[in-house]
Amino acid sequence: MAFDPASLTYDARGLVPAIAQDHATGEVLMMAWMNAEAVARTLETGRVTYWSRSRQSFWVKGETSGHIQRLVELRIDCDRDCLLLLIEQVGPACHTHRRSCFYTAVREGAEQVFLDPMG
């Protein structure tokens, strides 16, 4: 069956959350938003394209930083309202220069940063 990005369930803004996960390690790297066109562009090019809510424009991950994300596989959750992007990440995924955007844990009631920026 052919996939149609319009078959996904988008929120009122026309967006769906997309979780980027390293395809080799399983590490969750980041979460961002996609609209139907961003999904289509990602599938067409193999380069992950998100929708920037702040800039109201497409954002090809790594286009300016060089920290690109290559799509290995796109997965759809059971409700069709969230995507899992299995990717190959080049460099840090986070704008803070960390491998993952999820670098702060709450442990024993306190926040603890456990991941340093990459060199």
Curated annotation (Swiss-Prot):
Keywords in alphabetical order: Amino-acid biosynthesis, Cytoplasm, Histidine biosynthesis, Hydrolase, Magnesium, Metal-binding, Zinc
Ranges in coiled-coil conformation: none
Matches recorded under SUPFAM superfamilies: HisI-like (SSF141734)
InterPro entries: PRA-CH, PRib_AMP_CycHydrolase_dom, PRib_AMP_CycHydrolase_sf
Cofactor note: Binds 1 Mg(2+) ion per subunit. Binds 1 zinc ion per subunit.
Name of the protein in its database record: Phosphoribosyl-AMP cyclohydrolase
A GO CC term assigned to this protein in UniProt: cytoplasm
GO BP: L-histidine biosynthetic process
Catalytic activity of the protein: 1-(5-phospho-beta-D-ribosyl)-5'-AMP + H2O = 1-(5-phospho-beta-D-ribosyl)-5-[(5-phospho-beta-D-ribosylamino)methylideneamino]imidazole-4-carboxamide
Cofactor(s) recorded in Swiss-Prot or TrEMBL: Mg(2+); Zn(2+)
Oligomer status and interactors: Homodimer.
Example GO molecular function: phosphoribosyl-AMP cyclohydrolase activity
Binding site for Zn(2+): C78, C94, C101
Segments passing through the bilayer: none
UniProt cross-references to Pfam families, sorted A to Z: PRA-CH
Role: Catalyzes the hydrolysis of the adenine ring of phosphoribosyl-AMP.
Subcellular location: Cytoplasm
Positions of Mg(2+) binding: D77, D79, D81
EC number: 3.5.4.19
EC category: hydrolase
